[in-house]
């Protein structure tokens, strides 16, 4: 049975690419045609890639791999958090901070700081501080929660990065490739398939398209770990 049907992808608008002048020629194998100055993605190729991505992701999850979902643009942010949480993966959905992977020691220290502040807040320790100091600590807590909240369960570098919008997340791509961390990437017609191990050609701007792809990948992770795809909130941390 197909992981995703052509009708599902059509309804999600997964076939709409970018304007033809913005294309990357390396994506030509995944493009069906151009219509009104816009490239149309070949959904038969997308279906094949989705099947491959599902199997690869399921196998990786079954072998205990840890996943990081990355998508910081408005259309993807909420979906990234939802689907990553559903399958117990870590996520970045606000802003990619330089060194999140390549300077992991420093990043881990910031995550530990976030956990410390959360404990202080829940225990009432911050409320007991002088008003000005408490205000400073709460601002720090809010900032860390915004940018690092999705990484609290990540005690080590991820084994796989799942990416929405390769062009926007250039720094994430560069860091993952520098560390030889494989990428499962949604690829619009302006992307480079050579920069990922598991390509999924599709519209990476439409919310429904992002929901469809990330939802299936989350299903694959849950199936690989638990033998079912309906687990919610299972944690892949090392704690």
Swiss-Prot record:
- InterPro entries noted in UniProt: Ribosomal_uS2, Ribosomal_uS2_bac/mit/plastid, Ribosomal_uS2_CS, Ribosomal_uS2_flav_dom_sf
**Native source organism of the sequence:** Prochlorococcus marinus (strain MIT 9313)
Arranged from A to Z, the UniProt key words for this protein are:
Ribonucleoprotein, Ribosomal protein
* Protein name (Swiss-Prot/TrEMBL): Small ribosomal subunit protein uS2
One Gene Ontology molecular-function label: structural constituent of ribosome
For this chain, the family text in UniProt reads: Belongs to the universal ribosomal protein uS2 family.
Cellular component per GO, a single term: cytosolic small ribosomal subunit
Q: Name one GO biological process term.
A: translation
Lineage per the UniProt record: Bacteria, Bacillati, Cyanobacteriota, Cyanophyceae, Synechococcales
């Amino acid at each position: 049975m197909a992981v995703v049907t052509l009708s599902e992808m059509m309804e999600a608008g997964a076939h709409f690419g970018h304007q033809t002048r913005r294309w990357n020629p390396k994506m030509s194998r995944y493009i069906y045609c151009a219509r009104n100055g816009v490239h149309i993605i070949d959904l038969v190729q997308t279906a094949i890639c989705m099947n491959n991505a599902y199997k690869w992701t399921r196998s990786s999850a079954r072998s205990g791999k840890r996943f990081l979902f990355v998508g910081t643009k408005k259309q993807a942010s909420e979906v990234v958090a939802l689907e990553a949480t559903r399958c117990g993966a870590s996520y970045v959905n606000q802003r990619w901070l330089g060194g999140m992977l390549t300077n992991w020691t420093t990043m881990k220290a910031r995550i530990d700081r976030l956990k410390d502040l959360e404990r202080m807040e829940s225990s009432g320790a911050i409320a007991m501080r002088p008003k000005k100091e408490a205000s400073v600590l709460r601002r720090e807590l809010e900032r860390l929660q915004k940018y690092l909240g999705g990484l609290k369960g990540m005690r080590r570098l991820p084994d796989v990065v799942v990416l929405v919008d390769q062009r926007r997340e250039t720094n994430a791509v560069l860091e993952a490739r520098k560390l030889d961390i494989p990428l499962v990437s949604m690829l619009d017609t302006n992307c480079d398939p050579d920069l990922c191990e598991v390509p999924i050609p599709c519209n990476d701007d439409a919310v429904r398209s992002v929901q469809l792809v990330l939802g299936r990948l989350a299903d694959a992770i849950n199936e690989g770990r638990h033998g079912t795809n309906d687990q919610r909130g299972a944690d892949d941390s090392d704690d």
